[in-house]
Amino acid sequence: MESKVVVPAQGKKITLQNGKLNVPENPIIPYIEGDGIGVDVTPAMLKVVDAAVEKAYKGERKISWMEIYTGEKSTQVYGQDVWLPAETLDLIREYRVAIKGPLTTPVGGGIRSLNVALRQELDLYICLRPVRYYQGTPSPVKHPELTDMVIFRENSEDIYAGIEWKADSADAEKVIKFLREEMGVKKIRFPEHCGIGIKPCSEEGTKRLVRAAIEYAIANDRDSVTLVHKGNIMKFTEGAFKDWGYQLAREEFGGELIDGGPWLKVKNPNTGKEIVIKDVIADAFLQQILLRPAEYDVIACMNLNGDYISDALAAQVGGIGIAPGANIGDECALFEATHGTAPKYAGQDKVNPGSIILSAEMMLRHMGWTEAADLIVKGMEGAINAKTVTYDFERLMDGAKLLKCSEFGDAIIENM
């Protein structure tokens, strides 16, 4: 199939050498506009990023944006049922760093979730979700500023692998028959009309995630890494996640037992400070992030727990509208708006573009362009502090000025 993508005349590819990015002064970065409110938030993000790069580097650096397609727009460009073209996957692999708006879930069979499909096809095994408070953001908790965590959610395993069979299907009956007759399973309460699923959790998948979390804690001078799990109930999956995490910390980072264990301390080779490696049961953790958020820092968890935790934490600091996220693998990274497509607001220039703008800030940091990233944070803090905000914040603030989506982007630029 001929290419449907226009490659910019100016710009060069980001390359990878020995696991490190080589970022040219004028990188080509693919972006997916996204469905629904993607038409509003993505243009605002592009404008903010361009302004930050221009202000930080005075024209010496510039991003050449290249639109690629997934979701509803892809079906218009590639054909009726082409939601995730092979060309899109190839270009993300080739150009190493990309960013996307929100994507709809295709109606009917085939791909269950485009977001999950992108993560799995590209082996983006880390879902990275930093959660911090921006001064002035309306929050339901008394001290949102105490929440400052970075979540490493395992992206490739757990029940998100999508290995499940519908109740009353021949496949479900076959699996249940095998479990009962071959494996001696007696605990399926109602086997006659029962959907069934499988939860994979591997040593390799766990260790590469926990390794990345500890490396992040070292590089960013963080105090602790917490393994969150339900190992008290699921001993051989969630419990194994905890055990393999501790094992990796001992074997690769010289972790030493604290008071007989299981908690460990790891010395940060850059600062000499100790990083505590600890674990907590998932339901207790969801209590603790409300009661004692300051005690937690870098979080490593399996896929489902990570989904719950990152959204719960986002609400604590002011909602999913400004929660950034990234999906990172060894070969490439895809930064994303973490909210849905909100089709009823599409094209109204109304919604908060903060999530994809702060995801772009993460992207710039990933590229090593920290000066431009810092300007976006400064601009976001300034706009929110000045109470110049979109409708989702304006209705919760006293004396705020209501801005459109595009105007909020402009306010971020003005506050840089």
From Swiss-Prot:
Phosphorylation state of this enzyme is controlled by isocitrate dehydrogenase kinase/phosphatase (AceK). Succinylation probably inhibits enzymatic activity. Binds 1 Mg(2+) or Mn(2+) ion per subunit. Both Mn(2+) and Mg(2+) can be used, but Mn(2+) is 10-fold more effective than Mg(2+) in vitro at the same concentration. Inhibition of this enzyme by phosphorylation regulates the branch point between the Krebs cycle and the glyoxylate bypass, which is an alternate route that accumulates carbon for biosynthesis when acetate is the sole carbon source for growth. Mn(2+) binds at residues 307, 311. Disulfide bonds: none annotated. Changing residue 113 to D: Loss of enzyme activity. NADP(+) binds at residues 104, 339-345, 352, 391, 395. This is Isocitrate dehydrogenase [NADP]. Catalyzes the oxidative decarboxylation of isocitrate to 2-oxoglutarate and carbon dioxide with the concomitant reduction of NADP(+). Changing residue 230 to M: Nearly abolishes enzyme activity and strongly reduces substrate affinity. InterPro entries: IsoCit/isopropylmalate_DH_CS, Isocitrate_DH_NADP_dimer_prok, IsoPropMal-DH-like_dom.
